[in-house]
Amino acid sequence: MNDRVIQMKGYAQRTSNEWPAVGLSVPAWLSDYSNGLVVKGNGNLVRWMHVTPWKQDVESCDRVGLIQAMPAGDSEKDRTGRQWDQRTELMRDAIIYNRNNPSILFYECGNKGISREHMIEMKAIRDQYDPFGGRAIGSREMLDIREAEYGGEMLYINKSEHHPMWATEYCRDEGLRKYWDEYSYPF
């Protein structure tokens, strides 16, 4: 970014980003606090999981300086027919709604790989509705599809010959749901 190499590190956050006892209906300052914890914890990226985050979190990331990967929606695999059409419509709407937010640097087409034809279709949507945004578009498990601009793997293995590889869940530590101490990352 700006001719400098950046090591991306951060969290895969549930898009709902809810707080205990409060739920989803949180004030903007709490979104800033929550996303600011990622930045204070030496993170510089949030990969929202599965669906587009609400506008309050998108704008919060702009304010605190946290890079975002924005998904539109997925079902953990490629789809066909009306289900695929709905995903492309959702990506179109998400791009239009959020294209003026500078912290979004990535558009994610799915939590699982999609076909080459579908990747080409998603790129065409990005090119039509955000032609000058400079955002990369890709998906998990797309390292073998030349049209994808990045690809991700869930656990560590770089299978890429041509693309930047993203270890999308490098440390999937579910243990903190049960055990927590002063050395745990921000909660």
Model-derived features: where do they sit?
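N-terminal carbohydrate-binding accessory modules
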Residues: 1-39, 59
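Substrate-binding/catalytic cleft of secreted carbohydrate-active enzymes
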Residues: 32-187
